[in-house]
Amino acid sequence: MKILIKNTKIIDSSSSHNNKVCDILINNNKIEKIAKSIQIDTKTKVYKQDNLHISQGWFDMHVNFGQPGYEHRETIENGLNAAAKGGFTDVLLMPNTNPSIDNSTMIDFVKNITKNKIINVHVAGTLSQSQKGENLVEIYDMIKNGCIAFTDDKKSIQSTELMKIALLYIKNTSALLMNFPNDKSVQKKGVINEGITSTQLGLKGIPAIAEEIMLDRDIALCRYTESRIHESYLSTRKSIQKIKNAKDEGIKISADVALHNIFLTDSSTNNFDTRFKVLPPFRTENDNKAIIQGLKDGIIDVISCDHNPIEIESKKLEFDNAKFGIIGLESAFGLIIINLEKHLSLNQIIDKISNNPRKILGIKNTSIEEGNIANLTIFNPETKWIFEKKDIISKSKNTPFVGEKLKGKALALVNNNKFVEL
């Protein structure tokens, strides 16, 4: 494949061409030349649009594709198409399948389905066998087979002893240990944020301390073991402060926030719409302000979609009985720009969805430089559009954002010697 991308602004904080408008020539999966103007032969494909921007391929650290076991929610093929539509060239697949991804055979299953695609699928295995929180998986064996991270995701590791052992095991490996801080003994049967809204609606609340207590535990264990950890889906003001304090202390810790937890609050649930039922729940405006400041200050490293397809039968229920979850890949960038452009620079935003996930996961940087592999997302951050049902590629449709006015859109992907216009 040979293609020239004309007059595109490079947004890549790791590149010497950052913020420059250039032509980029891609040949045989590599960036062959970057210059103000490049002359080519008539056989080379040319891609040009108004206000083109280009970055390292976008990377989402939390996707659920359902297969195997939950194909009625999402297949891997569906999920990959949704990721591409949203502008993502890389995803980290969560192990929430049936059976769960807790052994090398399951890793092989995913690798066989996802090979030779334009999207790179990286595998996160469970930390405990069958996500039961009792016994560790065969960590070294799974790493040898390509597993790059371990997490029980929304089930969280409740056992302090198991988490301590896991941190010690993983300490001298290249893999990342991830945990969603949520003490289930505190959450109990809570379904939305504990506060005024939960009281008014008569719904059981999830206190902020359910997150904060476990975060304190994880930080203490990280300090004790001198290992490293990534905390997922942070949602409270105090959690952001705890991450800041831990980083200032020199503890090896990183963190992400789910996109929807940045700008929605618990008042979204006032009409009992289960499309707004997520875990962690939407918190308060003060929490959201702290999250935005945390993103701005670099305390929160990554923005993720937390793409979690749920079948309609499990959403069209009473709020207490409906499943947690929301899809997000297709609408992610438009929501990020429209909600964060006044707070973060475009370079900061792209770092959160591209450079930083790779850095945290230990994946080779694909900086936009001559000679490097071409893994790129082409986009226009100024495109205004309305998210419609036809834009949903996912098999499940559990999103509250249909009809929303968005800003910013992916236009094309370059990866694995393939070029796709979106």
Protein language model annotation of sequence segments:
Residues 1-40, 418:
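N-terminal metal-binding scaffold of metallo-dependent hydrolase/deaminase domains
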Residues 8, 318-321, 373-422:
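C-terminal cap of metal-dependent C-N hydrolases
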Residues 8, 24, 29, 51, ...:
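Divalent metal-coordination and catalytic microenvironments
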Residues 38-54:
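Active-site metal-binding motif and surrounding structural segment of the metallo-beta-lactamase
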Residues 61-74, 122-135, 204-208:
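Active-site mouth loops of central-metabolism enzymes
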Residues 200-226, 296-297, 302-303, 308-381:
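His/Asp/Glu-enriched, well-ordered alpha-helical/loop segment
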